[in-house]
Amino acid sequence: MTPVASETCDVLVVGGGPGGSTLARQLTRAGLDVLVIDKQAFPRDKICAGWVTPAVLESLQLDRTDYAQGRVLQPITGFRTGVRGFDETETHYPHPVSYGVRRCEFDTYLLHRSGARLRLGESVKSMVRENGGWLVNNAIRTPLLIGAGGNFCPVARMLRTDPAAPETLVVAQEIEFAAGADEIRGCGVDPEIPQFYFCPDLKGYGWCFAKGNYLNIGLGREDSHRLSAHVEQVRRLAARARRHPGELSRKIQWPRLSDASCFAQNPG
């Protein structure tokens, strides 16, 4: 017996991140009935330092004045970089080259701005091809199904018939938390100049970034081998540079490796 769908749409977009929400907005503005489904409820956290370039904001047609109302939009006009055993280097630009955002705010803003209908907190568990369309979760019928779920998109996973191409695994640990003005000043981090500390083997880097009343500290590497040791190494380098003091270090509770975000990236 053919299941009876409880909902229909012209386009079903799987994944409510910036890619999915931007596509949904364009399709909705073209007059299509678009439904976005995502396994997470929004706002949700995303392991990411959280900055976007002016070119991205322009492509998204994002009104900076509107977005900055009650949200973090931190101009970035320079970078401070360092590698263990070498002096730090500071680079400055005459105008903002990027903007710091909080992903929980940024992604939610784009998703709700899209104008699409939303089914959040719901995973895609089944997809059946029938009658020239798709039946998803035995509940949603659509003629067009789009996977926008990133590296672990369920659409890509379910439809892939060939072995996946060799990929480079990138893992990251990150924390973002509210901090007082005194704590941010104590870090010695200028909000307009994020700090980068590269691993000695140059296979990854850590960062310390102040934006609004928040600090974002993290590290990403090409592989997970001894990730915690590399995190500690970068933390000590930043502490020696007085980029985050002892009392702040005690507030940082790094996620376990099993909680770290893993990104699969095809080197080709």
Residue spans for each PLM region:
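Beta1/beta-strand and adjacent pyrophosphate-binding region of the FAD-binding site
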Residues: 2-17
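N-terminal Rossmann-fold NAD(P) dinucleotide-binding loop
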Residues: 20-21
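Glycine-rich FAD pyrophosphate-binding loop
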Residues: 28-47
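N-terminal FAD cofactor-binding segment of flavoenzymes
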Residues: 43-80
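FAD/FMN-dependent oxidoreductases across multiple families
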Residues: 123-126, 223-268
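Conserved FAD-binding catalytic core of PHBH/FMO-like flavoproteins
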Residues: 152-235
